[in-house]
Amino acid sequence: MPAVIQPHCITDPLTQSNCYILTAESHALIIDPNCYQEIHSYLANHQLVPEYIILTHEHCDHIAALNDMRKNYDLKVLCSAACSQGIQSTTLNMTRIMETYLYFKSQGELRVSYPPFICQAADIVFDDIYLATWRSHAIFCIAAPGHTPGSICIIIDEKILFSGDYFIPGEEVITRLPGGDEAVYEQQGKATLRCLPTPILTYPGHGGHFILTQEVKKEYGLY
C-alpha cells in the first residue's frame, strides 16, 4: 500500500482559494493551481517534479497559475470536458467580471486589477468518471455539475476527498456565478455528492479541511 498522502495547502490571500500539492516519490500532483510563485517555491524547496494538474472546476481563482505552470513545467492537465471548455472562456472562467465580483464581495473595500485571461484546453478530459493511478495512488474523479458545468470531486486512495467549491465550511452551495445552474445541481450535482463515501477527510476549494460525515451531508440537503 502506498503511503498516505498529506496534501500541502496554499491559500491565495486575494481570493482565499486553496491549491493542494500532493507528493509521491519526489514527484508532485497539483490540484487547482492558484499562486504560481508560492507553488514554484514549494516545489523547488522540496525538490519536487510536478507531473499532473487536476482542476476541480473552471473558475479563475482555481486556475490562476495554470498558464505559468504549463509554461515552466512539463506536465499534463486533467479535468472534465466542460471544465476544459470553460477555462478557454473569459465569461465561464469568471475573469471578465472578477474585479467587480471581488469589489462587491468585499462590500466595496477591495479594488484590484484582475486582467481577463484564458487557458488552453486540458490534455486529458472526461465526461462522467475518470479512473487513474499516479505513483501507486488511486485517483477517482467524478463529475458534479451545478456550481459550474465542469465541477468535479476527486478521491485519492479512497481516503481523502477534494471537493472543489462544494462543502465549503460555513457556506451554502453557490450556483449563481457564471456557469452555475440550480436545476442541474439539484438533478445531477446532488446525486454525485450523495454518493460520496463517509466519513472521509475532505479538502475543500476554500476554508479548512474537515471530516465529511452523513450529518454534514444532511446540512446541505443531501438525504
Model-derived features: positions:
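A structural micro-motif
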Residues: I5, L48, L75, H137-I139, ...
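Short, basic/glycine-rich phosphate-binding loops at helix/coil junctions
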Residues: N18-A24, K105-L110, F167-I168
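Conserved beta-strand hairpin/beta-sheet module of binuclear metal-dependent hydrolase folds
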Residues: P2-H46, C153-G164
